[in-house]
């Protein structure tokens, strides 16, 4: 019952990179070289043209931003709420882009160090996240993809808060986020503005940076998020509460957290 649909969904769900590219935009460094063949085909298949993209700035809401230390669920109830929010926030168009089964194909399990490494290399071999612009929507698509296809509970994908390189806070995940310079021509040219995702992605980031995923195998044996920014791990960092607050304040993160609480 429903076998044909399930098989079709599984086949479509196999190309995560295509799903992410369909969500919006293109990889950096290719604006002047032309769109990738796979992306062009995906646009044609979906029946959507570049005119659907907009230069209007997307309003940033810190309460929705994923890459902050206060976004990491601390309790089982918070985890359930986080997962439900991920599901509620992704609309019908996202479901079509992801193309995965409605229910997890395997039993749910927590992300582990070994599993994170395995998934990082698996995604890289399948085309990877390399160079794909990061935004909140693609963050949720990746969460949902790994939850439905691999049964991984979506409470693991957190990155350091920036500015600058955002390191994964889950040890073993080998994809970091790096700031990408957008050329002045792309910033100012109205035509390019319509097709270049960097024109809107910078509004998703509190520091105004455009971010892209980058594979870093060194993250398998160097916990850079903890080494560089232990304060973002709170009480787990081993730092005193006063030192944690001092470091977060110096980086402007406590101010962001306070603004979130009052908004």
From Swiss-Prot:
Region (Mediates dimerization): 140-156
Keyword Transmembrane helix: no
InterPro entries per the UniProt record, alphabetical: HIV-1_Nef_core_sf (IPR027481), HIV_Nef (IPR001558)
Covalent lipid adducts (N-myristoyl glycine), residues: 2
Ion transport found in the keyword field: no
One GO cellular component term: membrane
SUPFAM superfamilies named among the record's database cross-references: Regulatory factor Nef (SSF55671)
Keywords: Host cell membrane, Host membrane, Host-virus interaction, Lipoprotein, Membrane, Myristate, Viral immunoevasion, Virulence
Bilayer disposition of the protein: Lipid-anchor
GO terms of molecular function: GTP binding
Subcellular location: Host cell membrane
Region (Acidic): 88-96
Function recorded in the entry: Seems to play a role in optimizing the host cell environment for viral replication without causing cell death by apoptosis. Enhances virus infectivity and pathogenicity. Probably involved in viral immune evasion mechanisms.
Quaternary data: Homodimer. Interacts with host CD247/TCRZ; this interaction induces down-regulation of cell surface TCR/CD3 complexes.
Family under the similarity heading: Belongs to the lentivirus primate group Nef protein family.
Domain description: The N-terminal domain is composed of the N-myristoyl glycine and of a cluster of positively charged amino acids. It is required for inner plasma membrane targeting of Nef.
Name of the molecule in the record: Protein Nef
Organism for this UniProt entry: Simian immunodeficiency virus (isolate F236/smH4)
Lineage, highest ranks first: Viruses, Riboviria, Pararnavirae, Artverviricota, Revtraviricetes
Gene name of the record: nef
